[in-house]
Amino acid sequence: MPNQYEIYKCIHCGNIVEVLHAGGGDLVCCGEPMKLMKEGTSDGAKEKHVPVIEKTANGYKVTVGSVAHPMEEKHWIEWIELVADGVSYKKFLKPGDAPEAEFCIKADKVVAREYCNLHGHWKAEA
């Protein structure tokens, strides 16, 4: 059963969905169950995928990776998300954009997540 904020992807057509309200059932696309995109927190590519969270005067700045992630036509960050106090904030990106987002919110604890079109879903907490 899917849980709130989980990300699923169709292995056939590439559709991606985020669960906003967890119901009772499986997510199906193109006649097959969708694949849960587990959140990576570290691996050999950590310097390019794990979000870096910085507290700012106005809220939080999230940069993808301690080394700038490529933002090319074939390899880019599709979105950056910040979850704070049960609320999800997103910035959608496109090739050529900077792999970063600023969120003007007040919260003590946040989770940053991002999605790379080639390497999947990544997260960090602060």
Swiss-Prot record:
One Pfam assignment? Desulfoferrod_N
Listed EC numbers: 1.15.1.2
Q: Does the keyword tRNA processing apply?
A: no
Q: Kindly give the InterPro entries that the UniProt entry links to this protein.
A: Desulfoferrodoxin_Fe-bd_dom (IPR002742), Desulfoferrodoxin_Fe-bd_dom_sf (IPR036073), Desulfoferrodoxin_N (IPR004462), Desulfoferrodoxin_N_sf (IPR038094), Desulfoferrodoxin_rbo (IPR004793), Desulfoferrodoxin_SOR (IPR051233)
Entry keyword annotation includes Lyase: no
Q: This protein's superkingdom?
A: Bacteria
Which residues take part in binding Fe cation 1?
C10, C13, C29, C30
Q: Which EC class is this protein assigned? A: oxidoreductase
Per the record, what about its domains?
Is organized in two protein domains. The N-terminal domain has a fold similar to that of desulforedoxin and contains a mononuclear Fe(3+) ion, center I. The second domain contains a different mononuclear iron center, center II, with a Fe(2+) ion.
Give the protein family: Belongs to the desulfoferrodoxin family.
* Job of this protein: Catalyzes the one-electron reduction of superoxide anion radical to hydrogen peroxide at a nonheme ferrous iron center. Plays a fundamental role in case of oxidative stress via its superoxide detoxification activity.
Please tell me what else the database record remarks about this protein: Catalysis occurs at center II. Fe(2+) ion of center II is the electron donor and is converted to the Fe(3+) form during the reaction.
Complex and partners: Homodimer.
Q: What is this protein called?
A: Desulfoferrodoxin
Name the source organism: Nitratidesulfovibrio vulgaris (strain ATCC 29579 / DSM 644 / CCUG 34227 / NCIMB 8303 / VKM B-1760 / Hildenborough)
Gene that encodes the chain: dfx
